[in-house]
Amino acid sequence: MQNRPIIIGVTGGSGGGKTSVSRAILSHFPDEKISMIEHDSYYKDQSHLTFEERVKTNYDHPFAFDTDLMIEQIKELLAGRPVDIPTYDYTEHTRSSKTYRQEPQDVFIVEGILVLEDKRLRDLMDIKIFVDTDDDVRIIRRIKRDMEERGRSLDSVINQYLGVVKPMYHQFIESTKRYADIVIPEGVSNTVAIDLLTTKIAKILEEARNSK
């Protein structure tokens, strides 16, 4: 492993293709030590609230995340020490009792809707990416994901999108585009942007190895 891991931040609106872009980067480097860390894993524990109260949580607001813990754990990984990353139970709307062990890597992709919102987190990143996708495409993807993977009803997804997700995107997420080094329109389908990005990452890795 090289001396200092590369940190790549990937953000954009919910359903915008952040995870697909992150996975495209991962698949481009099968022989590298590279992992993805999701901001969603750091949703705050809500076990002290009733289920009805948890359901009303605004998950698209910065206060929903334990970003302090994420920053602390990324710093540990940068120092070459493993961490136990929390997991979130989307059916119970609270943090799970399970964690997973993340070992140090050469590259970490830090992915989530608000990973560029906190300056402390931005300052740890070597490359900052904003995936820019049309609102209509994002809501369709979100409906499909939340119904299939998170057990949500159509009405609940639509109501949450119109009441919380869309306004939070315009209030907190869209404005972080100005911090991005690279803006990728239409996400993973923009193969030119993905190729340019992976070429840049490969160059950074090569330079890091040559500087040893």
Curated annotation (Swiss-Prot):
Gene that encodes the chain: udk
SUPFAM superfamilies on file: P-loop containing nucleoside triphosphate hydrolases
Family matches, as Gene3D superfamilies: P-loop containing nucleotide triphosphate hydrolases (3.40.50.300)
Protein name per Swiss-Prot or TrEMBL: Uridine kinase
UniProt EC number: 2.7.1.48
UniProt source species: Streptococcus pneumoniae serotype 4 (strain ATCC BAA-334 / TIGR4)
The entry's keywords: ATP-binding, Cytoplasm, Kinase, Nucleotide-binding, Transferase
Binding sites annotated in the UniProt record for ATP: 12-19
Catalyzed reaction equations: uridine + ATP = UMP + ADP + H(+); cytidine + ATP = CMP + ADP + H(+)
